[in-house]
From Swiss-Prot:
Record disease entry: Prostate cancer, hereditary, 9: A condition associated with familial predisposition to cancer of the prostate. Most prostate cancers are adenocarcinomas that develop in the acini of the prostatic ducts. Other rare histopathologic types of prostate cancer that occur in approximately 5% of patients include small cell carcinoma, mucinous carcinoma, prostatic ductal carcinoma, transitional cell carcinoma, squamous cell carcinoma, basal cell carcinoma, adenoid cystic carcinoma (basaloid), signet-ring cell carcinoma and neuroendocrine carcinoma.
GO cellular component: chromatin; nucleoplasm; transcription regulator complex
Protein's name according to its UniProt entry: Homeobox protein Hox-B13
Keywords for the protein's UniProt record, in alphabetical order: Developmental protein, Disease variant, DNA-binding, Homeobox, Nucleus, Transcription, Transcription regulation
PANTHER family documented for this protein: HOMEOBOX PROTEIN HOX-B13, SEGMENTATION PROTEIN FUSHI TARAZU-LIKE PROTEIN
Species this protein is from: Homo sapiens (Human)
Function: Sequence-specific transcription factor which is part of a developmental regulatory system that provides cells with specific positional identities on the anterior-posterior axis. Binds preferentially to methylated DNA.
Record-linked InterPro entries: AP_axis_regulatory_Homeobox, HD, Homeobox_CS, Homeodomain-like_sf, HoxA13_N
Ribosomal protein in keyword set: no
Length: 284
């Protein structure tokens, strides 16, 4: 068909054959209805050989010619986008891949090798955590191998002394009963130097009294002469004090009613002992 003529019936049949076969997608470039018989040449026509990758197992597929294109003529150049936007997968073997350039750069630097303990024969053992350990660590103070008194021995030398001086255990003797003496400073072992240094202030403010701790009893406070005179006067008048008299004496002597009651009980017991002693001495 010449360029200036219109499309004939044979040309329409050729178009229907192309649409039914599905040989191409972009038929605008090959349609005889357009003003140009062929697409403009974008690049020189080059025949490419099929690519055979080393890792590919399937044979390359051959492209079948379109039924509407005459075979005798030279093939026209295919424009961009003729086969659509699809992609073709390929397989590549691992041997064809190139190694990373960074690995070659890092390979130029030698790797550090672990150093054995025999390479440091001149290193002193006191700078290590344990004796004979060829490490670079400083000795760490712990309660297991370091004494409390740091002046005993060289620094870093392991010691196995106890943390604090502990006195030996002694059970309390209750031979005299519950009213007997429970704790006395003179009978205990003297405390260690650490306890003396730590509690020097507290012991200075509250000096310990000998045998001051008793079970259920307070420290005895002696009565003054004025209080004893008032109590003896009332005892001479009446050996058994009444409630009103007890209140008056409590207000006059600044003593509690319980203290006055106990004093009268003790005074009666004392009088009985004195009378019994006089009676025993009078009998032949």
């Amino acid at each position: 068909m010449e360029p200036g003529n219109y499309a004939t019936l044979d040309g329409a049949k050729d178009i229907e054959g192309l649409l039914g076969a599905g040989g191409g997608r972009n038929l605008v470039a090959h349609s005889p209805l357009t003003s140009h018989p062929a697409a403009p040449t974008l690049m020189p026509a080059v025949n490419y050989a099929p690519l055979d990758l080393p890792g590919s197992a399937e044979p390359p597929k051959q492209c079948h010619p379109c039924p509407g294109v005459p075979q005798g003529t030279s093939p026209a150049p295919v424009p961009y986008g003729y086969f659509g936007g699809g992609y073709y997968s390929c397989r590549v073997s691992r041997s064809s891949l190139k190694p990373c350039a960074q690995a070659a750069t890092l390979a130029a630097y030698p790797a550090e090798t672990p150093t054995a303990g025999e390479e440091y024969p001149s290193r002193p053992t006191e700078f290590a955590f344990y004796p004979g350990y060829p490490g670079t660590y400083q000795p760490m103070a712990s309660y297991l191998d370091v004494s409390v008194v740091q002046t005993l021995g060289a620094p870093g030398e392991p010691r196995h002394d106890s943390l604090l001086p502990v006195d030996s255990y002694q059970s309390w003797a209750l031979a005299g009963g519950w009213n007997s003496q429970m704790c006395c400073q003179g009978e205990q072992n003297p405390p260690g130097p650490f306890w003396k240094a730590a509690f020097a202030d507290s012991s200075g403010q509250h000096p310990p009294d000998a045998c001051a701790f008793r079970r259920g009893r307070k420290k005895r406070i002696p009565y003054s002469k004025g209080q004893l005179r008032e109590l003896e006067r009332e005892y001479a008048a009446n050996k058994f004090i009444t409630k009103d008299k007890r209140r008056k004496i409590s207000a006059a002597t600044s003593l509690s009613e319980r203290q006055i009651t106990i004093w009268f009980q003790n005074r009666r017991v004392k009088e009985k002992k004195v009378l019994a002693k006089v009676k025993n001495s009078a009998t032949p």
